[in-house]
């Protein structure tokens, strides 16, 4: 896998000049036909600057218009209109949820942005029957889904660490967190989707109905359609969570304990690990501790320049089951090889745990440390290569530098559906590794991007077999390498559902009106 060298060089050049990546192209006249479309919602043609921003704060590509849909029909009408303009039109369309893309993936330069959050509110419906589920808009935030389903004592099974993301947004990628080892990513926990394709067709799909589109859209990076509704299976929600953290000095014990836990039948409900290279850094970011007594914060665990590893786990319980929970937790802890004096735990409500990152977000916003550039790197590493990777990256590349939390935890391949579009390593266990950097100032951004490049370059040369999660490439060769043997299937699905390459241009996979994507006869 070759890294996006050209992309990094462009970013570094622009940052050296003191700015972020902003594309300024001559403003074309907005097609008057857009204004003539009959809609339940409306277009904005002037106040569009917010749609040119994202969480990454590294790219800004202004659209020509923003659609605030009042219905799914508005989205279909708009996409169908652009489709009928034909292959010679340069107009593209991107669905934007809560704007948490990192490198402009949810943007559309001089195109149309669909503000998906306009679709939320009165569209959620919970069915609490024998096989409970919730129907949620693609623009609904997961935190709102949680609040609504908890009214029925129910909740989805699989989550992301941060809940202020849209349903359609995470399902277009994968949606991973500490529950993934058991339940799989969020894309493995979907019963049905409603999708508006690149032709403007509204299609309901599931594993049994229009299954190819269903699996294409899950993890499909928005390339095959706009997810306007998802049916998510639910399970009984616990009232409380026992939240634990322990520390390790030895990477082998740290990873072996994690692998043992994710393979056990009786285990914790959530398992994540993170790497602590710079203790000061870990205290000033969104993964900061839940309590001053947390071992990550405790002064008695000064690392003397050594890398520390923290294992974070939870056990769900209801108050009347506290004694049983205690026994189960103690049994599990007795099998682990952490530093005995580093154990810390606290009991919190289920929603307090799931929404933990938002609590840190509020503190960082108050300090002006949230809306800063986030040059993140998210990768997936085969289990067989994790020690080779860690030795070089944590021992050398990042030895003296860390601008944010580093997550590292294993998951089971058996919980992922290989019919979806997401790309994962071909091993039964693989690791999710996330370098979640915050960067203040052009020099810091440049430094972090350089570290990201060095990590990818090393992984490529050493044959680590890394796959990017939330992939960020700029050339067809890079995308072809990313998808490997699945590239042909991905291309064929694109031709079937978005033949003019109208959708999600910010992913930079296909160019509109490309000769390789002809209109079907």
UniProtKB/Swiss-Prot annotation:
It is found in: Secreted, Extracellular space; Cytoplasm, Cytosol; Nucleus. Glycans are attached at residues 57, 278, 412, 418, 472. One of its GO terms (biological process) is cytokinin metabolic process. Belongs to the oxygen-dependent FAD-linked oxidoreductase family. This is Cytokinin dehydrogenase 9. The lineage of its organism: Eukaryota, Viridiplantae, Streptophyta, Embryophyta, Tracheophyta. It comes from Oryza sativa subsp. japonica (Rice). FAD binds at residues 95, 97, 99, 101, 105, 161, 166, 172, 176, 227, 469, 507. Residues 59-237 form the FAD-binding PCMH-type domain. Its cofactor is FAD. The modification Pros-8alpha-FAD histidine is found at residue 100. Its EC number is 1.5.99.12. Residues 1-22 form the signal peptide. Catalyzes the oxidation of cytokinins, a family of N(6)-substituted adenine derivatives that are plant hormones, where the substituent is an isopentenyl group. Possesses cytokinin oxidase activity toward trans-zeatin (tZ) and N6-(2-isopentenyl)adenine (2iP) in vitro. Functions as a primary strigolactone-responsive gene to regulate rice tillering, plant height, and panicle size, likely via a secondary response gene, RR5, which encodes a cytokinin-inducible rice type-A response regulator that seems to act as negative regulator of the cytokinin signaling. Plants over-expressing CKX9 form short culms, increased number of tillers, decreased number of primary and secondary branches per panicle and have a very low seed setting rate. Monomer. Expressed in inflorescence meristems. Pfam families: Cytokin-bind, FAD_binding_4. Induction: Induced by the synthetic strigolactone analog GR24.
